[in-house]
Amino acid sequence: MTNPLNSTAANRSNQPSSDGISDGQITNEEAESLINKKNCSGHKLKEVTDSDTFSDNGKDDSDTKKRFHYHQDQRRMSLTSIVAVESPSSSNAPSRKTIDLGHGSDLIYIQRFLPFQQSWTFFDYLDKHIPWTRPTIRVFGRSCLQPRDTCYVASSGLTALVYSGYRPTSYSWDDFPPLKEILDAIYKVLPGSRFNSLLLNRYKGASDYVAWHADDEKIYGPTPEIASVSFGCERDFVLKKKKDEESSQGKTGDSGPAKKRLKRSSREDQQSLTLKHGSLLVMRGYTQRDWIHSVPKRAKAEGTRINLTFRLVL
């Protein structure tokens, strides 16, 4: 039987992309920025190695170990030295950033958690094989269509997940083996952590979003650890500190559009991260008790983003 991960990787690597950019070498920072921009526009990258080396002047460039390039008609442009972390378990472990939110709450962000091309392989698999649904939910007593696709995977025997009047169908981990590979990679960078459920979300464009909320359901306990892996188009992830009365009463705050509500918060009471393709964000401690978070609408986010949030149901 053909491995769906291998086949999707082959399809992606063989697809040309039109970029409208002239030939020439650019810096690593410019290359990464360009990659993120093109990913959000639905463009795909092809990975090349030493045997495919070339440059503007037509001379062999044997010093380049690994590059990504775009095709536009017969022109080629190389993005030099874009080398992803080989493996979360390698001796050259991916660098991480810790953000202390205060009062026992913190975040961990690993931008290059998974290798670049492998992340696209996972993206293709998830986009095509997950049974996505866009359910009707209830917000402030009104029924509306959830502004993103979703799916739920969990171990057997767990308390059912219910949010906004919606109870998703629970699929088995065995239904989607690549999810176990991603979970194993998380365990390698978060030793001692444990997760038994997964909520998947797919944002298909600029109008898809998630409003202000906290993942403070009782089934997760008072200090849940939530590991969030992102694939595809990068999107902003915004946190806002709850009001004192909201935090003490366990309320999740208002559910209004994140972009509008954000303007009412002070800079000290908010955090914003741009979650990259293949990145890992971990929320820990009392983050769900004291903070709410959102993924706002973004006019320039034309591509699809898939996000996996691993959780532990007690």
Curated annotation (Swiss-Prot):
Fe cation binds at H213, D215, H293. Residues 57-75 have a biased composition (Basic and acidic residues). Substrate binds at W132, A160, L161, V162, Y163, D216. One of its GO terms (biological process) is DNA repair. Residues 1-28 have a biased composition (Polar residues). Binds 1 Fe(2+) ion per subunit. 2-oxoglutarate binds at N201, R202, Y203, R305, I306, N307, L308, T309, F310, R311. Gene3D superfamilies: Alpha-ketoglutarate-dependent dioxygenase AlkB-like. One of its GO terms (cellular component) is nucleus. It catalyses: a methylated nucleobase within DNA + 2-oxoglutarate + O2 = a nucleobase within DNA + formaldehyde + succinate + CO2. Its main location: nucleus. SUPFAM superfamilies: Clavaminate synthase-like. It is found in: Nucleus. Disruption phenotype: Enhanced sensitivity to the methylating agent methylmethanesulphonate (MMS) leading to abnormal seedlings in presence of MMS. GO terms for molecular function: broad specificity oxidative DNA demethylase activity; DNA demethylase activity; metal ion binding. It comes from the Eukaryota. Expressed ubiquitously, including in seedlings, leaves and flowers. Residues 1-75, 242-271 are annotated as: Disordered. Its EC number is 1.14.11.33. Pfam families: 2OG-FeII_Oxy_2, DUF4057. Residues 194-314 form the Fe2OG dioxygenase domain. Belongs to the alkB family. Dioxygenase that repairs alkylated DNA containing 1-methyladenine and 1-ethenoadenine by oxidative demethylation. Accepts double-stranded and single-stranded substrates, with a preference for dsDNA over ssDNA. Confers resistance to methylating agents such as methylmethanesulphonate (MMS). This is DNA oxidative demethylase ALKBH2.
